[in-house]
Amino acid sequence: MAGPKHVLLVSEHWDLFFQTKELLNPEEYRCTIGQQYKQELSADLVVCEYSLLPREIRSPKSLEGSFVLVLLDFFDEETSVDLLDRGFWYLIRPITPRILKSAISLFLSQHSLHSVPESIRFGPNVFYVLKLTVETPEGSVHLTPSESGILKRLLINKGQLCLRKHLLEEIKNHAKAIVARNVDVHIASLRKKLGAYGSRIVTLRGVGYLFSDDGDKKFSQQDTKLS
C-alpha cells in the first residue's frame, strides 16, 4: 500500500495521543486526532476509547469490518469477550505512549502481511470483505463474520479445494469446541444467502469445499485429489 498508513486516534486524553504521535514515523503513519468517532471516516486503524465508541459500533449487528483498537479503563470480562467475539483488539490501562506506539506498529504490520482485497467480484456480484456485505443485482446481502471469512477463503481460492480444517480457522467463535459440523452450518447459511450462486459452493464429502468457476460443471468427490 503506497503512502503512510492513516491512524485515527479518538480520545479525550490528548497528552497520550500527542506523545504517541510524536513517536510514530510520519513517513510511515499519518495520524489524525479527534474527540469523536465518525464511521464514514476512512482509516487503516482506529484507536478509540471504549467510552467514545458510538452505540451502533458496540451493537452485535454493527459492521465488523473496521479495524479498531479499543482502549479500556479497566478490565471487565463481559466487555472483553464481546470485543474479542466481534474481532476488535483492546488494551487495558495503564497505557503509555510507547505501549500504544508498539501496538499500532504491530497491528498494521501484521495486517499488511495478511492483507486481503477490499472487494471480490463473482458474476454480477461484489463481495465487500471489510463490510461483510455482498452486493447483488437484487440488493445487499449481509453476512456474519464467520460466513464472511469462509466466503473470502473460498473466493480467493476459487476453483480450488479448501480443506475443512482451514475453513474452521475462519469461524469467529471463542468456544472451546469448534467441530467440523460448524463449517457445514455456515456453508448452508451462505448457500441460502447467495441464492443461485450458492450452488457454486461445491461439497467434496468428508474433505472440504470449493467455489466453482463454472456454474454448469458438475463435481463429485473424485474431481479433486489431495496430493
Swiss-Prot record:
GO molecular function: DNA binding; DNA-binding transcription factor activity; identical protein binding; protein homodimerization activity; sequence-specific DNA binding; transcription cis-regulatory region binding
Domain Response regulatory: start-end pairs: 6-108
Keyword tags: Activator, DNA-binding, Transcription, Transcription regulation, Two-component regulatory system
GO biological process: phosphorelay signal transduction system; positive regulation of DNA-templated transcription
Effect of I187A: No effect on DNA-binding
Result for mutant: R205A: Significantly reduced DNA-binding
Disulfide bonding pattern of the chain: none
Pfam families for this protein: ChxR_N, Trans_reg_C
Effect ascribed to mutating V207A: No effect on DNA-binding
DNA-binding region(s) in UniProt: 117-213
InterPro entries assigned to the protein according to its UniProt record, in alphabetical order: CheY-like_superfamily (IPR011006), ChxR_N (IPR055158), OmpR/PhoB-type_DNA-bd (IPR001867), Sig_transdc_resp-reg_C-effctor (IPR016032), Sig_transdc_resp-reg_receiver (IPR001789), WH-like_DNA-bd_sf (IPR036388)
Effect noted on mutating K192A: Significantly reduced DNA-binding
Stated role: May be a global positive regulator of transcription. Binds a cis-acting element of its own promoter DNA sequence and is hence probably also involved in its own transcription activation. The recognition sequence is 5'-WHGAWNH-N(3-5)-WHGAWNH-3', where W is A/T, H is C/A/T, N is G/C/A/T and the linker length in the middle is 3 to 5 nucleotides.
Summary of subunit composition and partner proteins: Homodimer.
Protein known as: Atypical response regulator protein ChxR
Species annotation: Chlamydia trachomatis serovar L2 (strain ATCC VR-902B / DSM 19102 / 434/Bu)
